[in-house]
Amino acid sequence: MQRGIVWVVDDDSSIRWVLERALAGAGLTCTTFENGAEVLEALASKTPDVLLSDIRMPGMDGLALLKQIKQRHPMLPVIIMTAHSDLDAAVSAYQQGAFDYLPKPFDIDEAVALVERAISHYQEQQQPRNVQLNGPTTDIIGEAPAMQDVFRIIGRLSRSSISVLINGESGTGKELVAHALHRHSPRAKAPFIALNMAAIPKDLIESELFGHEKGAFTGANTIRQGRFEQADGGTLFLDEIGDMPLDVQTRLLRVLADGQFYRVGGYAPVKVDVRIIAATHQNLEQRVQEGKFREDLFHRLNVIRVHLPPLRERREDIPRLARHFLQVAARELGVEAKLLHPETEAALTRLAWPGNVRQLENTCRWLTVMAAGQEVLIQDLPGELFESTVAESTSQMQPDSWATLLAQWADRALRSGHQNLLSEAQPELERTLLTTALRHTQGHKQEAARLLGWGRNTLTRKLKELGME
């Protein structure tokens, strides 16, 4: 199999230069173009094995170019590149038939590997993707690699109604992802029905899911449709599926197998066509081992797994998320959006965020109301944010350790708006160590220097700098 011919189109000459040399270094023949019109003109006489195209270019953008290429050369794999790493870009690229999606900045070795995979795909004459364009936008934001993986999965599932299991800590945005999977699916125009298993009393879950007949139990005065019937033709999102009682799990498994169920108190089967998206913050494999979750139901639901990372594992997304939530809160309250001081933005990025994206969103709502000025300063942030971060960072330390005390001091200083903490702390640290060492050696400087790991001249200089002569 020959190495392959690659075309690159990007209005950024530096991107063209880097890719051309990297691809040539991998033994591939590379030709570069500045705009989409040049590519279409060249395609009239020859065809590459793969095309890499930027998504935002003057004149014809990457998606418009992709559309024309798919009309003329439907088997040609196209990789869409973009510095604007958002869900809509990923989904639009996949739905118009892109082979894959490459967010900038990219690792050059990964880019070359992706190109080689696309060439192999083309040379083996596999069928392309060709799906209708996307639905409404969502508020899923993420440039972190883990979130790009989530976008990629949503894009690849955009023509499917397969079951999906979403797992992630509380507050990571599992329902947002479920909505996105529904919006970008063939069922987008049908209902999306959500039900949180943890929020429903156990004795009402069956009635909520499957409905009930009139007279099925005390208070059942009319026939009631359950969530399965309400979601017919669409998507049923079962949040916190790990909390579902075992007897209801058995009924759910039967519905997934047969496509029909009986209302509570009913004798006539009700047929439904429903896609199931389930979510949990629990370890379902462990629940299966403990006998708290049916293994056969787990395998029914776990066809495609989507893992949502906690916010602490995607810190690069925090500034963009915070700006977005401040804009949303301002629109809701009819006020001007707050701005984040650069130091505040940096502080938000360092915090623990045990409540994940939901906690960040609520913090931005709080700041919109409570921050005094138009620009949010560090001292405007609620104190509990720092307390949770200190608690997490010192959880492995002894309560009276010097590191714990230092962390608590730094926390108080940052909350008071102090800057240049190191220049403030280092002299005090050295003064404390010197005083203690000299006390330990009864004032013998050479011995104190040895204990501290300094030379005698260094100790003499430090005593002078610190005013301790």
UniProtKB/Swiss-Prot annotation:
InterPro entries reported for this sequence: AAA+_ATPase, CheY-like_superfamily, Homeodomain-like_sf, HTH_Fis, P-loop_NTPase, Sig_transdc_resp-reg_receiver, Sigma_54_int, Sigma_54_int_dom_ATP-bd_1
General function of this protein: Member of the two-component regulatory system NtrB/NtrC, which controls expression of the nitrogen-regulated (ntr) genes in response to nitrogen limitation. Phosphorylated NtrC binds directly to DNA and stimulates the formation of open promoter-sigma54-RNA polymerase complexes. Activates transcription of many genes and operons whose products minimize the slowing of growth under nitrogen-limiting conditions, including genes coding for glutamine synthetase (glnA), transporters, amino acid permeases and catabolic enzymes.
Binding, ATP: 168-175, 231-240
Processing after translation: Phosphorylated and dephosphorylated by NtrB. Phosphorylation induces strong cooperative binding to DNA.
Organism: Escherichia coli (strain K12)
Residues of the Response regulatory domain: 5-119
Compartments reported by the entry: Cytoplasm
Oligomeric and partner information: Homodimer. Phosphorylation of the N-terminal receiver domain leads to the formation of oligomers. Can also form phosphorylation-independent oligomers.
SUPFAM superfamilies named among the record's database cross-references: CheY-like (SSF52172), Homeodomain-like (SSF46689), P-loop containing nucleoside triphosphate hydrolases (SSF52540)
Gene3D superfamilies cross-referenced by the UniProt entry: 1.10.8.60, 3.40.50.2300, Homeodomain-like, P-loop containing nucleotide triphosphate hydrolases
Superkingdom assignment: Bacteria
Listed name of the protein: DNA-binding transcriptional regulator NtrC
